[in-house]
Structure formats: C-alpha cells, structure tokens
C-alpha cells in the first residue's frame, strides 16, 4: 500500500501520531499495532506481507471509520469537526495509506472498481444516488448522512427489522466497489 508519512510521534504518547492535513491543519490519530511495527523490523520477515493482509487492511478501514462515529454531518467536510459521506470514505482509506477520490459514484479511472453488490465485504464501498457508505458486513453500513433523524456519521442497516434500518437506502443501493 502507499503509506503516507506522518509529522512526528506525539510527545509522551507513543501510541499516537500527527498527520499534516490540508491548510496546515494537524490530525492526531492512534497508531494501530500494525503501524507500530517499523519498516526495519519488517525487513527479512517472511510474514511481513501477512501483517498487512487484506483482512487486516479491511479491519483497519472500519476502525478508522468508527473513529468518526457521531461526528456531525458537514457537506464537503473531512475532519472530526464535520464530515460528509465521501469525506468519511476518503479519510478512512487515506489514513490507511490509500488515496481514493472524494466521489459518490464509480467513474472511469476511479481507484475503486465495481463489484457485484452481493460480493461486498467489510471495508468495501456501497454507492447510492449521490451518496457513498462503507460496508460493515451483515447488511450494515457506516456513513456520513444529513438525514433528518441522524445528521452525523452513523451506522444503519439495509436489512428490514434490524436496528437502524433505512428502507430508503435499501431501495436505492445501486453499486458496490472495492480496491481488491
């Protein structure tokens, strides 16, 4: 994966690091155990690729998305101060070293390719008209929504009878995409 560079570890908090964001903003994030392993420690390790396996990467995408849970909806936003659907997808991938476009549709040249909806796995993206969400598995999604009932990053279900079920989303689901 293309790994982004961070500014510096946070003083006195070795499990946290700082990232430079747009317009001189600084983002502080917790380092997961995979990121805590230095490149020199991975050299010569036969299982280095296993440490950054697809499953591990997918889990990390979800952990990053959950960081924003409850963050207020803000059209065009991509920070903990306010975020929209494509901002959540973008930041969840970006903070894990993958640059995807901030778009709510799969377009030619987009780093995410279309897959059959029924083959979506946790960490893949689900697309709706003008909207994108991260698939959690078991019919659940996490997304930044301006919906009147929950104008924030929230978890909803596409399965009737489940908590957080949104019929409008179930009925308008139009595509799924994956980087794998």
Residue map of PLM features:
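A conserved glycine-rich beta-strand in the N-terminal activation segment of trypsin-fold
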Residues: 132-133
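Catalytic cysteine-centered active-site loop
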Residues: 71-121
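Loop/turn positions that initiate beta-strands
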Residues: 25, 39-43, 123
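Short, well-ordered loop/turn sites that connect or cap secondary structure elements
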Residues: 120, 126-127
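Aromatic- and glycine-rich peptidoglycan recognition patches
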Residues: 9, 17-19, 23, 27-35, ...
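Surface-exposed edge beta-strands and adjoining flexible/disordered loops or tails in beta-rich
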Residues: 5-11
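A structural motif
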Residues: 54-64
């Amino acid at each position: 994966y293309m790994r982004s560079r961070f500014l510096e570890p946070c003083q006195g908090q070795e499990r946290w690091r700082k990232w430079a964001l747009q317009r001189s903003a600084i983002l502080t994030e917790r380092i997961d155990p995979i990121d805590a392993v230095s490149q020199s420690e991975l050299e010569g390790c036969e299982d280095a690729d296993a440490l950054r396996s697809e499953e591990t990467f997918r889990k990390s995408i979800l952990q990053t998305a959950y960081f924003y849970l409850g963050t207020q909806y803000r059209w065009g936003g991509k920070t903990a101060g306010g975020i929209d659907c494509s901002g959540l997808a973008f930041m969840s991938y970006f903070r894990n070293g993958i640059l995807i476009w901030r778009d709510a549709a799969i377009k030619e040249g987009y780093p995410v390719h279309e897959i059959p909806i029924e083959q979506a796995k946790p960490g893949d993206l689900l697309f709706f008209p003008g909207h994108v969400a991260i698939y959690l598995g078991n019919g659940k999604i996490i997304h930044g929504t301006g919906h009147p009932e929950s104008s924030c990053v929230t978890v909803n279900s596409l399965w009737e009878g489940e908590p957080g079920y949104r019929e409008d989303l179930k009925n308008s689901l139009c595509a799924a995409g994956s980087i794998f």
